Amino acid sequence: MKTELIAQLKKTIITVKDFPKPGILFYDITPILLDPKLFDQVISVMAEVAKKSNADMIASPESRGFLFGVPLANKLKLPFVLVRKQNKLPRATFSASYDLEYGKNNVIEIHQDAIKPNSKVMIVDDLLATAGTVDAISRLVKQAKSEVVSYSFLIRLKDLGGIDKLDQTKPIDYILEY
């Protein structure tokens, strides 16, 4: 099933050169959302990985991470932690800074009460590039006195080395690789 899913995803995802900046090749995943059957298959594959990791909650960054994290958490009946850009959450927060492939000095936050101590958190995002966002989320989880138990991505960009920056003792899953 995964081989067929990969083939369908590669036909569906649109690559856009020089977006959002010159030199960046952007993978537009929005056509996946126009195909409910395909989107459901993606979430089902991510759910199988999540079940094996014994995660008890899912955390994803805005905005495209939400597209996969929320339905995955719902499918597994797990709580979902919103990871937002700075000053977007109304209550006390934990904060972590990070850099992206195409931007520096970013800050993300979670509510301080979003993750209970000793929780087992799976980080879900649409794309793994440099791992800047994922590293920042991992630090937020640690601030909440909890543990990242696994990672799941729709796409991994292999030339950017992000996977090497993740905790290799934890399950790391992705569906597509470019």
Curated annotation (Swiss-Prot):
GO molecular function (one): adenine binding
GO biological process, one term: AMP salvage
Recorded metabolic or biological pathway in which this protein acts: Purine metabolism; AMP biosynthesis via salvage pathway; AMP from adenine: step 1/1
Coiled coil location: none
Keyword Cytoplasm: yes
Localization per Swiss-Prot or TrEMBL: Cytoplasm
Catalytic activity: AMP + diphosphate = 5-phospho-alpha-D-ribose 1-diphosphate + adenine
EC number(s) from the headed UniProt entry: 2.4.2.7
Chief subcellular location: cytoplasm
Protein name (Swiss-Prot/TrEMBL): Adenine phosphoribosyltransferase
Organism: Mycoplasmoides gallisepticum (strain R(low / passage 15 / clone 2))
